[in-house]
């Protein structure tokens, strides 16, 4: 306000509820720090008035869930907050449209959720006379299943008859962090013609016991029935088009970032070059020590 008096601004509100498969993907409600708590909106109005700021947009984001009732409730609550600011013309309900990467998961039905939200906006306009432009952010919904990670089997080990058989890959949480961070699952395919299968715990190459690709929603180890593999077998990890390369633990354990290719009309085009060791070391400075 002091730097840009009179500017048009937007603010994010925490509507008091959220949605997600676990705490780490739920970004609304009392346990989430994002946004201004919904009962504190009056303070926003006071600050805006003090600095002659125009609140023209209001934003909320609840996490990654697919329950249309939650979206309906959040839309109603966000519209009620928007009514407090006469200059608001746009309501952004954020993203978080759940995408099923695994066959056991349920994607958000955009038609169902959209109909619920539409009814809320139409009813609100009829009741209050206030019409708002609706914005959403469906980035993950559009891109999650548009990418795959290719890797190899580095090693196969086991912990005895009462333990597990581990399929160790030459990739890990440094490239796909979602399983380690969110206990998320990705489809995994062994590219061979083997008709026999084995129950594997699939793990990454980082020096972390949490670098696992096969865990349940509570982060417990699970096995995945896959084609029986040999060292060197090519592996495809699917569903890597969103929140994978963009939020990877780049250079963790000094592993280089993974090159990226774009498939355009049947032709592969490089969009991120392989990273050389000299590129990782280029940002490091060794000072003269006394």
PLM feature spans:
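Short acidic, glycine/serine/threonine-rich loops at helix termini
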Residues: 1-3, 19-26, 69-71, 102-106, ...
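Active-site-proximal beta-alpha core segment in soluble small-molecule metabolic enzymes
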Residues: 1-90, 99, 111-112, 116, ...
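Electropositive, surface-exposed helix/loop patches at the edges of structured domains
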Residues: 6-9, 94-99, 279-289
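Active-site beta-loop-alpha junctions enriched in small/polar residues
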Residues: 12-18, 60-65, 94-102, 139-141, ...
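Catalytic alpha/beta core domains of metabolic enzymes, predominantly
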Residues: 93-94, 134
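C-terminal helical cap(s) of enzyme catalytic domains, especially alpha/beta-barrels
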Residues: 105-115, 254-259
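Nucleotide-activated donor-binding/catalytic signature segment of Leloir-type glycosyltransferases, i.e.
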Residues: 128
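Charged (often Lys/Glu-rich) extended helix/loop segments that serve as interaction or gating elements
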Residues: 131-290
């Amino acid at each position: 306000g002091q730097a840009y008096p009179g500017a048009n601004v937007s603010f994010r509100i925490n509507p008091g509820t959220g949605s997600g498969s676990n705490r780490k993907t739920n970004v609304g409600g009392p346990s989430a720090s994002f946004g201004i708590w919904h009962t504190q909106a009056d303070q926003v109005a006071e600050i805006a008035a003090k600095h002659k700021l125009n609140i023209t947009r209001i934003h909320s984001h609840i996490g990654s869930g697919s329950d249309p009732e939650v979206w309906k409730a959040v839309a109603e609550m966000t519209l009620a907050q928007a009514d407090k600011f006469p200059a608001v013309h746009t309501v952004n309900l954020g993203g978080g449209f759940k995408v099923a990467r695994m066959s056991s998961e349920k994607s958000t039905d955009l038609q169902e959720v959209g109909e619920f939200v539409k009814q809320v906006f139409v009813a609100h306009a009829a009741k209050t006379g206030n019409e708002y432009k609706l914005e959403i952010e469906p980035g993950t919904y559009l891109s999650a299943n548009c990418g795959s990670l290719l890797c190899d089997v580095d090693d196969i080990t086991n912990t005895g008859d009462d333990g597990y058989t581990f399929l160790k890959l030459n990739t890990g949480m440094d490239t796909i962090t979602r399983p380690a961070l969110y206990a998320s699952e990705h489809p995994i395919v062994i590219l061979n013609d083997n008709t026999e299968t084995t129950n594997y715990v699939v793990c990454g190459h980082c020096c972390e016991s949490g670098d696992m690709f096969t865990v349940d929603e509570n982060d417990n180890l699970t096995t995945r029935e896959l084609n029986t593999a040999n060292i060197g077998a090519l592996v495809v990890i699917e569903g890597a088009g969103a929140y994978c390369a963009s939020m990877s633990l780049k250079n963790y354990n000094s592993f280089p970032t993974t090159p990226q290719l774009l498939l355009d009309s049947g032709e592969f085009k490089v969009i991120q070059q392989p990273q050389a060791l000299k590129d990782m070391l280029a940002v490091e400075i060794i000072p003269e020590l006394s």
